[in-house]
Regions:
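Active-site mouth of glycoside hydrolases
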Residues: 1-176
């Protein structure tokens, strides 16, 4: 990581989006926070302030812990997985875990000047049509749009000093 962030610094990069995953929090919350802190220390050494992405609606909806499948050569983001996975997204009884994740991660780093911003949900309206659309719940967008305000509320409750945002996929979100 140090080597690659050094390359990024050499190219003039001063920020980057870093995608996190709720399953890693579920597996080992304290270890996850420790690793994020280590990453932030390395990034700061290279004058890079990341935007941490908490949730993502793009690519493989069947995320799981453990050994991941090998990347497919020549396929863009072939190993990328969504957070939350489709099972969690469709199960409101799992939402307290998501709340714990958001409040725990954001709360731990709410005043950390090494972080530029929090992208609460990347492309919440992306239906993943070109890659995994056939695996997605038919009502995925409705599920995400119902959870999105809650995710923002959790991040606000954690009292983040950094801006909160959501990188939308398409359309006019001014009324949301």
């Amino acid at each position: 990581i140090d080597l690659e962030l050094g390359w990024a610094e050499g190219l003039g990069m001063n920020t980057m989006r870093v995608f996190l995953h709720d399953l890693l929090w579920q597996q080992d919350a304290e270890g996850f926070k420790r690793r994020l802190d280590q990453f932030l220390t390395i990034a700061a050494k290279h004058k890079i302030k990341p935007m941490f992405v908490l949730f993502d609606s793009v690519w493989d909806p069947d995320a799981k812990l453990g050994k991941q499948r090998a990347p497919k050569p020549g396929v863009h983001n072939s190993g990328w997985v969504q957070s939350p996975n489709r099972t969690t997204l469709q199960d409101p009884s799992a939402y307290p875990h998501l709340e714990s994740y958001v409040k725990g991660v954001v709360g731990a780093f709410a005043r950390d000047q090494r972080i530029l911003a929090w992208d609460v949900w990347n492309e919440p309206d992306n239906q993943n049509g070109g890659s995994y659309g056939d695996l997605e719940p038919k009502n995925k967008v409705e599920l995400v749009l119902a959870l999105l305000p809650r995710a923002f509320a959790w991040a606000r409750e954690a009292k983040a000093e950094q801006p909160l945002t959501s990188g939308v996929w398409k359309g006019d979100w001014s009324a949301q």
